[in-house]
Structure formats: C-alpha cells, structure tokens
C-alpha cells in the first residue's frame, strides 16, 4: 500500500514547522486494490452491518493519526477526505468526530469533494467547512478562458459557498484542496489530472 510510515509523517510535519509553516494533517483513504474506483465510491452496496464495520476500522485509523497530529503540534486536522458515499451516515460520523476530538485539540474539518460538500449533514460538529475546490470554470471547448471569464465563473460558486456557510451558522469555509494544471483545458476539468 502507499501509506507513509508514522516516522515519515512526523518528519514531514517537523520539516514544515521548522520552515515556519502551519500544518493540516489530512489523511486520505485510497482503494489500492480497486483502481477503477476512488475513495468517493466506497461501499455503495454495503449493508448497515458492513457500514458499522467500516466506520469502526476507519475510526481506529483516523484517531491514530489524530493522536500523532496532536503529539506533533499540528494546527488543523481533517477527519476525512472526499468520502462521498459515507457522508449520509451521520451518527457514524458524529461518533468518529467525537473520538477525534478526544485525541486532537486543534481545529477540525472534513475535506468535502466540491460536488458533495453541500450534502454533509454534520458540518456543525466541526470547526471549519472544508471543500476540495476543483470547480470547472470554463465551458467545454474553451481551453483558454480569459481572466474576466474566470472571475465571472467564480461568482455563482462564491454565492453557493456563502449559502453553505450561512446554512451552517456562518461557519468559515476552508479550501482544503484547489488546483488547476498549467495546460490548455485545465479550467474545464481541474480534477482530471
């Protein structure tokens, strides 16, 4: 599997802190044994028992990293990343978040996929709304949008984000990921790298 060792994670955190950077630890779950699917498609046909088993294992994993993050003085921690098919399991997530809070004293977020962040019903249990912001900003065929077109494309997205914040008591939004490659067409499908 591609999991770094705890020693490697600690080294990276310490190196970032030595440079004066703040650190968010944001563990990812990848499906190494299933290259045709991604983390947002975990368990689409799971039974309730299978979901409970999955969340028990997930909680063990994520609290391990929360404790590591706390020991290293990490400033922010993401309780999950783009686990789209799991977000409707509110009771399970609230239990995971409570277990993470018992280990980690800093700010907590969840890195919601841009298509799925509005569907998370438990933002109130976290300190920040996290969005992996790979929004398409150009129409199909527009490989080189102008600055004005990009600014215009952001306006409805900013309004949607403001609504998401307002619906959650004015909670702040953090872009937990954002990126556009330096190539023609990147603004159409920025997640496709």
Where are these regions (language model features)?
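Substrate-binding cleft and catalytic face of glycoside hydrolase catalytic domains
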Residues: 1-86
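Well-ordered, non-membrane alpha-helical segments in soluble/globular domains
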Residues: 3-9, 59-62, 93-95, 148-160
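Surface-exposed amphipathic alpha-helices with a cationic face
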Residues: 10-22, 70, 93-105, 161-168
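Glycoside hydrolase catalytic-domain groove-lining segments
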Residues: 11, 26, 107-109, 116-192
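Aromatic-lined carbohydrate-recognition surfaces of secreted/lumenal glycan-active proteins
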Residues: 22-29, 75-88, 96-118, 170-178
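Short, electropositive alpha-helical surface patch
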Residues: 35-54, 91-99, 184-193
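Short, isolated positions within intrinsically disordered regulatory regions of eukaryotic proteins
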Residues: 42, 55-58, 97, 126-127, ...
